[in-house]
């Protein structure tokens, strides 16, 4: 059984029988498939808690953060987005 959990408008968690997969949503810019969404694999994780850590790590490295307080705010914002996504899956 595989899963697909949308985390905000930028991330998607998928899985296969062995691992959880962190993907970033991207849009094809040129060619026949211009405008179509595709998933760029960021990493493979054996446990969901490791994926969440990877998501936070990757998000922090790609965000424009200039202070520790801004980093804390960004992590908190991401945690709320994750919480809402996981609540939606439960329903």
Curated annotation (Swiss-Prot):
Highest rank taxon of the organism: Viruses
Listed InterPro entries: DUF5405 (IPR035404)
Pfam family, one: DUF5405
Family according to the record: To phage P2 ORF83.
Protein name: Uncharacterized 10.4 kDa protein in GpA 5'region
Organism for this UniProt entry: Escherichia phage 186
Gene name of the record: CP83
């Amino acid at each position: 059984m595989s899963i697909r959990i949308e985390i905000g408008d930028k991330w998607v968690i998928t899985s296969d029988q062995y691992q959880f997969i962190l993907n970033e949503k991207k849009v094809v810019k040129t060619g026949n498939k211009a405008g179509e969404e595709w998933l760029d694999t960021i990493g493979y994780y054996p446990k969901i808690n490791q994926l969440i850590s990877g998501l936070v790590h990757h998000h922090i490295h790609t965000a424009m953060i200039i202070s520790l307080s801004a980093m804390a705010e960004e992590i908190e914002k991401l945690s709320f987005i994750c919480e809402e996504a996981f609540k939606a899956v439960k329903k």
